[in-house]
Amino acid sequence: MSAPKKVVLAYSGGLDTSIILKWLQTEYDCEVVTFTADLGQGEELEPARAKAEMMGASAIYIEDLREEFVRDFVFPMFRANAVYEGLYLLGTSIARPLISKRLVEIAEAEGADAVAHGATGKGNDQVRFELAAYALNPDIKVIAPWREWDLSSRTKLIDFAEKHQIPIAKDKRGEAPFSVDANLLHTSSEGKVLEDPAEDAPDYVYQRTVNPEDAPNTPEYIEVGFERGDAVSINGEAMSPATVLTKLNELGGAHGIGRLDLVEGRFVGMKSRGIYETPGGTILLEAHRGIEQITLDRGAAHLKDELMPRYAELIYNGFWFSPEREMLQAAIDASQAHVTGTVRLKLYKGSVRTVGRWSDHSLYSEAHVTFEDDAGAYDQKDAAGFIQLNALRLKLLAARNKRLGK
């Protein structure tokens, strides 16, 4: 790749991307445009602007993408009940396509030669950023400094920062912070003591949730309303997508809901350990499953459950903009036509549980399932023929085994 003259950098204002900004300037002698996405990470983003200005960025973009993030990425994913490896709600994975989309759009608007990101050469994010970028612009050039420079450790990064007078953030304990990714859906923490999967994560790692043991001793009941698979209200109050998730985060965080200690299989081949906090997402998943229980046909629900792991894997691996993800999304969205109604949930000391659900689109018929007199709604004699037909192949198999002496 010829040396770029202008690069758009996905910039958080943190240590890694600040070092990358300086490295791009010194390594390529190029203009650097910074792009900072507000995805609800809960930080004041103006310091990122000030830092980028101080370091000589030629243009600075800071954009509030919270509504777009939840409406166009998080909610479609939750219609699928997507979970990776049975536990992970994909909080980091689902944020990357939107960041890449805006990186490419800004690069085109600025006439930039390339885009750059701060993902390491060991992780999944490098794949996610770059697959999304190439899917949107096949001619885009991507610079991944972690795959080029010799700053191969946190210690070397800090030495570089000190040499170039780049401020180094400290945590409350006066130490360099964990590697943290945060957005409106979740917070993840990696590195340091967490790299030993045998060690219990210290409580100071958690930023978004109280310890469940310290959560209120009285449960809280809430109601979440859905329309066509998307949450639209809490306790009867209509809300925008980002507002729904923000409120669920507040409720879940106060009750210690959504903590996860996970060793996951990365797309690049290795296993990694992360601490995830997804309070609102954990409530949303439980609520969505609750409303589907009464509105989704059994066959459609079971097919959705079969498709979900593949869908989740596509998002985890960075294939949001792939045709196969879009095909699955179309099927999932079609299944949500009648997923409308209300779910009541109980929040208590780290747990969320559906305790009630109702809908004008419900398939639940009390007349058919009652243990009392069903007034002729269901003739139990019909079950005999149903069983005989389904038993036929099993009886034929058993007869063959008997004939062959097995």
UniProtKB/Swiss-Prot annotation:
Catalytic activity as recorded in UniProt: L-citrulline + L-aspartate + ATP = 2-(N(omega)-L-arginino)succinate + AMP + diphosphate + H(+)
Record-listed ATP binding positions: A10, Y11, S12, G13, G14, L15, D16, T17, S18, A37, G118
EC numbers: 6.3.4.5
GO terms, molecular function: argininosuccinate synthase activity; ATP binding
An annotated GO cellular component: cytoplasm
Annotated compartments: Cytoplasm
Domain of life of the native organism: Bacteria
Location (main, coarse): cytoplasm
Positions that bind L-aspartate: T120, N124, D125
Family indicated by similarity: Belongs to the argininosuccinate synthase family. Type 1 subfamily.
Name this polypeptide is given: Argininosuccinate synthase
Lineage: Bacteria, Pseudomonadati, Pseudomonadota, Alphaproteobacteria, Rhodobacterales
